[in-house]
């Protein structure tokens, strides 16, 4: 199978499974993020891919060749990968161009070829004018660019990124996200990106693998992950959401105070009994007057809390009938006082049943 | 429970049989062989000599069979037992003296506004550079019973014919031993004083404690572990020292262990008995260091671990000159006076004639450089051995420290233990071990530079290891992982990244080894051959021949070369490289 394949991958430290039964197939040229809270096993997974940690179960293969297995692994230096580290790990004893040339020199390329490639990649990351500087003379963002250049210049089989932006300030981080995306689009390197920042993962990735407690929760495109979360963890970790408990039966889901026909919601549901759904704050609309819309669920109630976040309002709406509370996002022009009566419309197509 | 129908994260992996084996040639890292090689070196340097030492102490010299006779012979004579108890007594008194010298100086230089702090610091550093046996010679020139300068001044002043001071006495022995080693107390205790954050003392002040109470209740308890550690090391240094007893304890008729050991090594050669007799020295050292570990492990003694914050300087007022007076006395006794008389003697026709222009000459230097049979070669040999020992020890230690810090192999802790274990072996005992293991046929390295270089490397491996280990710990592992993921092995990472990053640390460690290695006496004494004498041994020969002026000239030359090397090092490393070590 082409690409990078993790098969039932597991790593145990003492009595703790840091990673367990992790299956993942990354196609050639794909950019996949491992996203999860700290301690979820994403960095362990990445370091297993790099070869710094051996798995205790399962295997890793690249283009059909086994790289890692509990019985032994190909060492990192023989994998033809490259990596961008959290600390950048730019060698302070070498200049920018020496840092970038290091991997090429290890590959015993002729020196004019090395020079040409280093020049070209420094051009790409806009660092040509600083080629002879030492790392101590560079800013954090510039060091990050050097790390990026050093990693891509060898045209690695797989590029691994270990929270590369976590040491940068917010503005720079935003800029570097697009930089990384741009580099990927330009070189089409199979990439695995570890982060706990969903924004980073959303911008850069073709697909995001959400991890929790050493296991894969869901892998999907950023849009699918946001609009169709499959588990409670994914729904709450990616963006904000409302969880509602209901009961499923007779082609309807019954919630406190209202019911939705199964046919109207976007997902197929089989069987019956208790069910949990996720409704994003953006899947609802608040209005001051009763203006029932076709195919929408209309609830009457009032605004209980409000906070202004700049790009949106964050309201808490409480239904009069059931007392249920909803977080609702509204554009800045939709101003409601706390305590004001309001009507809520929910788009049933955006109600997503989830597994607990 | 309702089941939401979505496909499991992926199911395709179940379809395919999993073959999990990476071919061995892909798994092979050439570096792994290096680790094996290093373990082999440590066996040669440490395990084999020490094992041979212990085994030969139980071996019958004639039959080669097992025996306890060596122990009977070693401890059967009252004289031999006296030497043991004398050694312990001397060690105890030396510790008291070294602390009395080192602790006040360390406090004065780090925590007070005493004038001349840098002068005191440099002078103490001079004590590090001057080998103890040269200080001993200096004091023989100063306080020899008949011709010592102090006594001659006393005779002419008082008309008495009795000496005022006599260096050939128990007092002389402990004084000279103490001045030759108190710099270690100074270094350890000053760095402890520098680690204390003044906020700890401020906290006591704000609660109502005065300066004296604060010092007694807060400051000194915090440096106590350093003082205890320094005291133990002082004791071990004192009982293992060879040069000073060789000069003083024989004329003083005060037999000590090291001198007794040389007796076993003179004709008739009794290595097995010497081995048996050196075992207590080894056991005492091991026990002392074990004791230190035990004391330091106790809770409450761990507070001096933080990074030093801002330190408050104690304003001494009028007392600053009193303290300076005391410090001056100590550095005068330990460095200035012996160094001065040594230089003067080196340039004198006859040191007993006192100072006059007619007495000045360069002939002593000419003699040791061009006429004497072995001193010129010895200078080259000593400096060369110093360079080789420092370089090999640092290189070896860097690799070992790397393996240990990065936990590359199972039981890497054992490598660390081996690398620091020569610490508990006094130089003279190490020499006996090397003699027993490698001097005689079939290996027959006796009298070669090789056996001395090996022994010196072993002797200084602990310093090298401690320095390298701290250095490696300060390097982020990702620095090396970046090398490896780009296709370089661990050895490449060591050569291109770890090594260059540790250049300064390693150079500092190199100097800390070079200085004592170029002067080393106790390890050399049993290993030198007729054609491979080192300066320290030639100096002792000259002292036995009574050629003190020529001895002084040769000693000065050695000092000048070492000072030059250290000066170059300090230019490159900054002057405080020695104090930064803890």
What are these regions (language model features)?
Chain A
Residues 76, 80-82, 86-233:
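ABC ATPase nucleotide-binding domains
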